[in-house]
């Protein structure tokens, strides 16, 4: 005897997007002397430091508002002595990476390539992916430039990440923009990782012994955009934004 049921009701299952992350972990990577700590402290305090301990690695937090959304930004200022050798401590922690080189130091640019390869290999297949920003620092040293802007843009294009050039000792808003853009990229990746699932079946009579299984249909979301060369422009209006709440730990001399 086969059991028969009447008309099945249409079923729609939709994935509901999660709330935007209220906390974003950003890891700063790069060769020693590239300006990682200077960029971190500039973002946190709006000041440029002239001295710091290159062997100090620590994590700092700042309450920010990005696109009218509050977010707690945690920044890990790393102090790798030999490049990307022991990255376990930050790879699993990070939501985003900012990889820094100095435009007046070609070897720091080559170290960046190693970091990009390490992060790219780790992030492959992760959902959501951890976005990466390639950052050329010390544009105030233009006359000593060893890495052209075209070289930086080409490397970013190769790894599909954003690319900027700034100076930690000059404009604060340009540095702030980099960190806020990292937050935006994390939010975008979170949205991309949500794949809506739609199931719809409408049969007048379905037999348990012969009814085919329901098949889930997935709609693929667009792939992330490739590298973009961004020119950061300051705005006096932006300077009226609320100053971030800062948690700054030991190891820095602020001037």
UniProtKB/Swiss-Prot annotation:
Its EC number is 3.6.5.2. SUPFAM superfamilies: P-loop containing nucleoside triphosphate hydrolases. One of its GO terms (cellular component) is plasma membrane. PROSITE patterns: RAS. InterPro entries: P-loop_NTPase, Ras-related_GTPase, Small_GTP-bd, Small_GTPase. The keyword GTP-binding applies. It comes from the Eukaryota. One of its GO terms (molecular function) is GTP binding. Keywords: GTP-binding, Hydrolase, Nucleotide-binding. GTP binds at residues 30-37, 77-81, 137-140. The keyword Ligase does not apply. Belongs to the small GTPase superfamily. Ras family. This is Ras-like protein family member 12.
């Amino acid at each position: 005897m086969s059991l028969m049921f009447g008309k099945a009701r249409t079923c729609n299952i939709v994935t509901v997007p999660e709330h935007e992350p209220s906390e974003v972990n950003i890891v700063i990577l790069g060769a020693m002397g590239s300006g990682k700590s200077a960029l971190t402290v500039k973002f946190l305090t709006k000041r440029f430091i002239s001295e710091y301990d290159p062997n100090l690695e620590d994590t700092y937090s700042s309450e920010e508002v990005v696109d009218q959304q509050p977010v707690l930004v945690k920044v890990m200022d790393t102090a790798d002595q030999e490049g990307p050798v022991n990255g376990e401590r930050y790879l699993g922690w990070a939501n985003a990476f900012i990889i820094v080189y100095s435009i007046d130091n070609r070897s720091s640019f080559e170290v960046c390539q190693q970091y990009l390869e390490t992060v790219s290999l780790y992030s492959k297949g992760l959902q959501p992916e951890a976005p990466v920003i390639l950052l050329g620092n010390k544009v105030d040293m233009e006359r000593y430039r060893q890495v052209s802007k075209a070289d930086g843009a080409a490397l970013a294009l190769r790894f599909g990440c954003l690319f900027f050039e700034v100076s930690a000792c000059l404009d604060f808003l340009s540095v702030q923009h980099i960190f806020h853009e990292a937050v935006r990229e994390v939010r975008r990746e979170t949205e991309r990782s949500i794949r809506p699932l739609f199931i719809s079946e409408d049969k007048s009579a379905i037999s348990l012994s012969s009814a085919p299984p329901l098949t889930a249909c997935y709609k693929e979301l667009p792939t992330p955009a490739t590298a973009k060369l961004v020119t950061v422009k300051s705005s006096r209006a932006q300077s009226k934004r609320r100053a971030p709440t800062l948690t700054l730990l030991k190891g820095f001399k602020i001037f």
